[in-house]
Amino acid sequence: MLPQRPQLLLLAGLLSLQSVLSQECTKYKVSTCRDCIESGPGCAWCQKLNFTGQGEPDSTRCDTRAQLLSKGCPADDIMEPKSLAETRQSQAGKQKQLSPEEVTLYLRPGQAAAFNVTFQRAKGYPIDLYYLMDLSYSMVDDLANVKKLGGDLLRALNDITESGRIGFGSFVDKTVLPFVNTHPEKLRNPCPNKEKECQPPFAFRHVLKLTDNSKQFETEVGKQLISGNLDAPEGGLDAMMQVAACPEEIGWRNVTRLLVFATDDGFHFAGDGKLGAILTPNDGRCHLEDNLYKSSNEFDYPSVGQLAHKLAESNIQPIFAVTKKMVKTYEKLTEIIPKSAVGELSEDSKNVVELIKSAYNKLSSRVFLDHNTLPDTLKVAYDSFCSNGVSQVDQPRGDCDGVQINVPITFQVKVTATECIQEQSFTIRALGFTDTVTVRVLPQCECQCREASRDRSVCGGRGSMECGVCRCDAGYIGKNCECQTHGRSSQELEGSCRKDNSSIICSGLGDCICGQCVCHTSDVPNKKIYGQFCECDNVNCERYDGQVCGGDKRGLCFCGTCRCNDQHEGSACQCLKSTQGCLNLDGVECSGRGRCRCNVCQCDPGYQPPLCIDCPGCPVPCAGFAPCTECLKFDKGPFAKNCSAACGQTKLLSSPVPGGRKCKERDSEGCWMTYTLVQRDGRNRYDVHVDDMLECVKGPNIAAIVGGTVGGVVLVGILLLAIWKALTHLSDLREYHRFEKEKLKSQWNNDNPLFKSATTTVMNPKFAES
C-alpha cells in the first residue's frame, strides 16, 4: 500500500495545481500562439478560423479554456500544450539504489512537470573508507592504537559490505609562523620532548591508497611518526579538501565513500591564512606532489561552505571522530556539511571501530535528495514520502530519516520553467551515494496546429494561415492580408498610427490597417475604445461610489474626463450643483470667506468650516481701524476731511454688539480710544462701536523735573563731601591717639651716646709700685 499513497498525492496535487493555474490568463502583447503559451500556464489559444470579429485583436484568441469555450471556440480548436514527464527505468542487472535512471521533461512556462524518484537502500553496498588522522603531538597515544587497527577496520567493513577498502592520510598544519615554529631545529624535530623521535611538520600527507589489504594498512601506518605545531587549531580542512579533490590519488571508487576525520582539537578556516601572510584563496583543486600537499603555504585554508560543496560534489560522507571537548564544535560543523556525522573519540582512540560503525548506520539511514546548480529560469521542489510515515511538501531538497534496507521511499520532484528555456540537463542524486537521475529538459512552447489551417486562400492568396492567424507575404498587411503597401515601408504606414511619434502603435489598443487605426473590441463589458489613435475610452475616468463618473445618472466618461449633467459637478460628478449648505444666516455663501464646492465650504486660510465664520488664529486689526474710528466718532484725525470716502465701508454702531473684539488704541492727540470691532461677511470688513469717553493723560512738569534733578545732584555732592570730611577726621584722630600712647611709653634714663666729657684722667703705672 505504501507506493500507492505517493501516486495518489501526486495526482491530487497535479489536479489542484492545474485547477488553480487554469483560472486566469494574464496576457500582454499577444499576437501568436507561442506568445499566448508564454503568457501563463492558464492561457490557451483558439485556432478556429474567423474566431475574431471586426476590430478584435488577435489577442482575443488567447484566454483560459473556459473563456474560449464560452466565446464559441470548439474544444478541438483549443491549443493548450501541457508540461509532461517521460521516464526511463534502470537497465536490468545493474545494482541501483536510485531510480529512474533518466527523465525527459517538456516544460511549459509556469506549469510544473512532476515525476517520482524512488530510493531503495541496498544491503552490502561497497564502501571505501579513508582514515584521515591528526598527527600533532597531542595525538601521540592515539597513533599507537591506530597502527593496530587495520584488521579491525576491515572486519568492521566486511560486516556491513562484501567489498570494503581502507586508506590512510595524516595532517598537521601549514609550515609557516604562527602555525608552526620555523626555527630550523624545531622544523627538524617539533616535539617538546627532544629525546622523542618526531617527523617534521607538514600540511597533508597521503600515506596509503585505498586497499583491501589490512596488513599493508598496518605496515604503512606503523611507519608514521608523531609531529607537532604551535597553535591549537589544526589544518584539517586543508587535508579534507585534498582528499576530496584528488580522487585518482586517493583511489576512490564509484561506491559509498566515507572519510573518517580523527582529531582532538579545532580547525583553521578561510581567512586564518592571513596570519601567515597567505592571501590567495583556496582554489579547491588537487595539489598533491609525491603524496604531499606542497602548495599548502601558497593557498589559504578553505571555507566551510567551500569544503561542504566539494564533499557533496565528490559524494564523500565525513565522520568526525573527535574527543569529548570538541564534540559540540563539530556538531555545529555538521549543520553546514550535509551527510556528515560526529562521534566521541576516546582519549586513546580505542573505540574508533565502534564509532565508525555507529556513524555509518546513522548516515546511511538518512537520505537527502538534491540537484546540481540550475539557472534562475528553472525551479525544483521536492515532496518527501518517507517509510516512517513522515511527509514534507515543497522543500528545496528531499529529506527522509529512518531509511531501512530494501524498503523503498518515494520523492516527488516538481520542475517548473519561468520562461521558454533552451534544451538542457541537470542531475539529481542522493547525497553520499553514487547513483544519479539524469533529467533532460525541453521547452513546450510551440502549438501543434492543424496543417489544414495553413490554407492560403483564407488569406486572399497573399499569405498563409497559421493557428488561425494570417501571416502575410511581403508587400501585404492586414487581418486577411487585404492591404497592399504600394512600396511604402511598414514603418511609414505605422507612423501614421502613432500619436505624437510615440513608439506605441494605436496606443497599444488597436491595429494599424493600411495606415489607419482600427481599435480593438475590449474584453471589458461595456468598454468602448475609440479615437484616431485609439487613445480614448469610456471607462478610464475618475470613479465615485464605485462607478465611472458616478454612473450614467450623474455623467459620462469622454476620453478620460467626466462630463456631468446639469445637476452635478466635480471631477467624478460626485457633487450636486447646490450651495444651500454653504449659506450663513444672512444668505451669504461661506460668509464671503471661502468657496462652495460640492455644497461644502472650502474656507480661506485660518477660517473654520462649516461656514467660515470664525478665525481663532487671525490677528485683530485694531490698529488698522484706529484712524476710521477717530474720524467716525470724534470727527478728527488723519481722515477727518474725507472720512466718508476713506471709511465708507465701516459703519459706526450706536450700541454694543455681543461677540465683538475689544480694542484700545491712541488717537492723533495721544488719547486712548476704547472701541469694539464687529466682523461682517467678507474679508477685512468690520463695523465699530466706540466708547464716548477718551482717556487723555496730562503732560509732565518739566520745571519740576529739571529742578528736582539739579537739587538732587547738589545734595548728593554735599553728602559725599560730608562723608569724606568725617572719614578724614576719624583717621587723624586715630593717629593722634596712637602718638599719645607711644609718648607715655618713652623713658630717658640712658646717657647720650654722642656726648664726650671735657676731662681725661691718666694713671701712672709706676706709681703703684713705689
Curated annotation (Swiss-Prot):
Both Ser-746 and Ser-757 become phosphorylated when T-cells are exposed to phorbol esters. Phosphorylation on Thr-759 (but not on Ser-757) allows interaction with 14-3-3 proteins. InterPro entries: EGF_extracell, Integrin_b-2_sf, Integrin_beta_N, Integrin_bsu, Integrin_bsu_cyt_dom, Integrin_bsu_tail, Integrin_bsu_tail_dom_sf, Integrin_bsu_VWA. Ca(2+) 2 binds at residues 173, 229, 231, 233-234. Residues 124-363 form the VWFA domain. Residues 23-701 are extracellular. GO terms for molecular function: amyloid-beta binding; heat shock protein binding; ICAM-3 receptor activity; integrin binding; metal ion binding; protein kinase binding. Residues 1-22 form the signal peptide. Glycans are attached at residues 50, 116, 254, 501, 642. The modification Phosphothreonine is found at residues 759, 761. The VWFA domain (or beta I domain) contains three cation-binding sites: the ligand-associated metal ion-binding site (LIMBS or SyMBS), the metal ion-dependent adhesion site (MIDAS), and the adjacent MIDAS site (ADMIDAS). This domain is also part of the ligand-binding site. This is Integrin beta-2. It comes from Ovis aries. The gene is ITGB2.
